[in-house]
């Protein structure tokens, strides 16, 4: 499996965010997106997730399902946790699991995902009572509940304490070991080998 971008360009709100952006990320590898605010890190993740149109260039995911759009093979975790306050922790995750898989999800699968992010003891608690860090953990539980080969993570450590970050890094590490791909916009050093794509207002550069 390999994610390949060739001469990508993105325009948002009539402003060109980036252009001529090319990179390759093989299966089992992660790429960290770096740079100051407003240079296009979030826009790039949203573009790969199919939420922003490709203005120019090509984007391919080889080794995946050829007849399935990249967006349907990816997990996108943005700044918003997208939870319903009135639903319980378990109900929120079950909803997203059904939505992402188009099929019922076994209770054991939901429990395992909640356990992976440290929320199993709060399964029956309405989401409105969760702290910001717990809400982030619940959003991250989608990664464990439904298997998808491409993870697109926008500041995934936001609001997480040290334990929460450790659980996230464990999830990402297992995903990479299984041959998955991860792109993460983050200012936090990741505890595994990553390639870095640095974006800047004047352009971008790639670093090992």
Task: Indicate residue ranges for each PLM-predicted region.
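Conserved ABC transporter NBD signature motif
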Residues: 54-72
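Conserved ABC ATPase signature
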Residues: 126-133
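Catalytic Walker B motif of ABC-type/P-loop ATPase nucleotide-binding domains
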Residues: 151-155
């Amino acid at each position: 499996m390999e994610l390949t971008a060739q001469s990508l360009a993105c325009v948002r709100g009539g402003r060109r965010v980036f252009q001529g952006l090319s990179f390759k990320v093989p299966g089992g590898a992660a790429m960290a997106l770096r740079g100051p605010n407003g240079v296009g890190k979030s826009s790039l993740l949203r573009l790969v997730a199919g939420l922003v149109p490709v203005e120019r260039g090509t984007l391919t995911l080889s080794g995946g399902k050829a007849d399935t759009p990249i967006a349907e093979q990816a997990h996108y975790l943005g700044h918003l946790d997208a939870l319903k306050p009135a639903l319980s922790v378990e109900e929120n995750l079950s909803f997203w699991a059904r939505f992402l898989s188009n099929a019922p999800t076994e209770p054991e699968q939901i429990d395992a995902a909640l356990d992976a992010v440290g929320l199993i003891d709060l399964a029956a608690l309405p989401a409105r009572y969760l702290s910001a860090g717990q809400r982030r953990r619940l959003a991250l539980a989608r990664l464990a509940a439904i298997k998808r080969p491409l993870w697109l993570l926008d500041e995934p450590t936001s609001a997480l304490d040290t334990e929460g970050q450790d659980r996230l890094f464990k999830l990402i590490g297992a995903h990479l070991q299984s041959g998955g791909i991860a792109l993460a916009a983050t200012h936090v050093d990741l505890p595994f080998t990553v390639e870095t794509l640095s974006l800047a207002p004047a352009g971008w550069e790639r670093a090992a």
